[in-house]
Amino acid sequence: SFPVPVPARGIHCLVLDEDVAVYETVKELLGANHHVLWRTTVASALAVIASQHIAILVTELQVGDGDSSVMLKTLKQEYPDVLTIVNTSFKDTLRVSQLINQAQVFRYLPKPLRKGLLAKSLESTLTRYKQLQDVPALKVASKVEVSQDVQEKALSSKIMDYLSRLRAKGFGGGVVVQAV
């Protein structure tokens, strides 16, 4: 069942992981009709998100410049139609359940990466993305509330400010960036 069947027009998928094999597997599964971008830090991922319409984010929770959890929660506030697949070796069930509830993580996949499971997850994620595009009310329902945790609120505010500054500098104009 490779590559994964997807909507007629190409989408942008961002892989945030230090492991190039994850990027290469996602790129192989989505095929040539879609844009798969790869970043290894939260900061560089935010630059891509500010410049591209990202449909799917495949991410590890711990990356080069820290924890991506707050970024995931913040992105869901600003970009409710971005669907996230978390692929991680972390087994902290409280943290995972918080991400599912607060950041609306669409799929959680344990590492090591299993290609068949990732393929099925990408397929269901693309189906859900198409539903979000076809029914605008679903996008509104997908938006999450701002975190009440003081530290998360402060970091979330910094992330939102960073995204705004990137857009103001012209990163919102559709520049395609392929790799690190």
Language model features with spans:
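Two-component/phosphorelay signaling modules centered on CheY-like receiver
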Residues: D19-W38, V42-S44
